[in-house]
């Protein structure tokens, strides 16, 4: 592993541990030349997933797009980046579990909505308002009524 400070190719692993629910190995390294310490992450290389968008165009699947979309929806909400990361991990796992190389963008949006409904209702509504691109307020009101009813059912249990 090349040192980010001096560019030397020799480094020693100081610490190694599992991260992201065991899907990644986090290694703390020290450069043998300049003693600079840095962190690397190792994960299994997955097959490439292609997202088919509404207009028919295709692009490579990006965890970052999902993560950033959720981060925007969760602004000023009590949702940690670790929680969001776990949501993104679950979504990616579900998508890869399908054994399909191409995934519809609507399927990804639906999975995000399912996860956010469990995580935080306000984040869910914010994401839904962009994802579903409501035509008028009545569509948003309908969604809010659904959420209110499901919240009442959860509390009754």
UniProtKB/Swiss-Prot annotation:
Cofactor(s) for this UniProt protein: Zn(2+)
Coiled coil spans: none
Co-factor binding details: Binds 1 zinc ion.
This protein's UniProt keywords: ATP-binding, DNA-binding, Metal-binding, Nucleotide-binding, Repressor, Transcription, Transcription regulation, Zinc, Zinc-finger
GO molecular function: ATP binding; DNA binding; zinc ion binding
InterPro entries membership: ATP-cone_dom (IPR005144), NrdR-like_N (IPR055173), RNR_NrdR-like (IPR003796)
Gene Ontology biological-process annotations: negative regulation of DNA-templated transcription
One Pfam assignment: Zn_ribbon_NrdR
Highest taxon of source: Bacteria
unnamed Zn finger ranges: 3-34
Keyword RNA-binding: no
Keyword Transcription regulation: yes
Positions of the UniProt region annotated as Disordered: 1-22
Domain ATP-cone, first and last residues per copy: 49-139
Function: Negatively regulates transcription of bacterial ribonucleotide reductase nrd genes and operons by binding to NrdR-boxes.
HAMAP family: NrdR
Family per similarity comment: Belongs to the NrdR family.
Protein's UniProt name: Transcriptional repressor NrdR
Organism: Streptococcus pneumoniae serotype 4 (strain ATCC BAA-334 / TIGR4)
Upper classification of the organism: Bacteria, Bacillati, Bacillota, Bacilli, Lactobacillales
């Amino acid at each position: 592993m090349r040192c980010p400070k001096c560019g030397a190719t020799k480094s020693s692993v100081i610490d190694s541990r599992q991260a992201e629910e065991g899907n990644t190995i986090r290694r703390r390294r020290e450069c043998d030349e300049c003693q600079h310490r840095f962190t690397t992450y190792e994960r299994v290389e997955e097959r490439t997933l292609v997202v088919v968008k509404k207009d028919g165009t295709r692009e490579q699947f990006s965890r970052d797009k999902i993560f950033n979309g959720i981060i925007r929806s969760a602004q000023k909400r009590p949702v940690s980046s670790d929680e969001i990361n776990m949501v993104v991990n679950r979504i990616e796992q579900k998508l890869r579990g399908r054994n399909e190389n191409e995934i519809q963008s609507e399927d990804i949006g639906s999975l995000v909505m399912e996860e956010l409904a469990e995580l935080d209702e306000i984040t869910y509504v914010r994401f839904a308002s962009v994802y579903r691109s409501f035509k008028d307020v009545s569509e948003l009101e309908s969604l809010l009524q659904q959420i209110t009813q499901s919240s009442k059912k959860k509390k009754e249990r």
